[in-house]
């Protein structure tokens, strides 16, 4: 029987060792859509981290009572309930941010990270370690979102959290904002660069090639 992972492992490994976006390539859609500024990136990061942590906790608590044939439905109901709570809290206390995030808070319900941890980890492990696994994967997702939001808002608008950092030419400053960074496709390139940097730093994350080219032989050797 495999040893149960420790809380420390499940909390910190997803940040660098097994990042949901950087290594598993999950949660890409929301990473493209909500990282044009740090405010929306931060709120989305907190929302997904809380939903992942508590959905793991509740699913793990009842994992032995869930029939295998309907386990996915039960997981979806729990996740959807938590997302509705988060969405209502945002609408009550941060309505403008809720409007900026649009449908992406609701789409946490179908986020691969949340569903994946519920199925792969919470269904097979005790509640406490499952909770921290959800928090850890949320932190890994959050780290990537905050890096993207920082780069895109700083160099795309000259601001951080809406506060001017680089004086732009429109305000009599020296910095010409790069508007391309505020467009969703720019996040694709930034994610690619971050993945390249992570795999350059951690060689064990580099995937083996799917196939190898056959060695070239001369016509004389062929006959």
UniProtKB/Swiss-Prot annotation:
GO terms for molecular function: oxidoreductase activity, acting on NAD(P)H, quinone or similar compound as acceptor. It is an enzyme of class 7 (translocase). The keyword Hydrolase does not apply. The chain crosses the membrane at residues 42-62, 66-86, 103-123, 131-151, 178-198. Its EC number is 7.2.1.1. The keyword Transport applies. It catalyses: a ubiquinone + n Na(+)(in) + NADH + H(+) = a ubiquinol + n Na(+)(out) + NAD(+). Keywords: Cell inner membrane, Cell membrane, Ion transport, Membrane, NAD, Sodium, Sodium transport, Translocase, Transmembrane, Transmembrane helix, Transport, Ubiquinone. One of its GO terms (cellular component) is plasma membrane. Its main location: membrane. It is found in: Cell inner membrane. Composed of six subunits; NqrA, NqrB, NqrC, NqrD, NqrE and NqrF. HAMAP family: NqrD. Belongs to the NqrDE/RnfAE family. NQR complex catalyzes the reduction of ubiquinone-1 to ubiquinol by two successive reactions, coupled with the transport of Na(+) ions from the cytoplasm to the periplasm. NqrA to NqrE are probably involved in the second step, the conversion of ubisemiquinone to ubiquinol. This is Na(+)-translocating NADH-quinone reductase subunit D. It comes from Pseudomonas paraeruginosa (strain DSM 24068 / PA7).
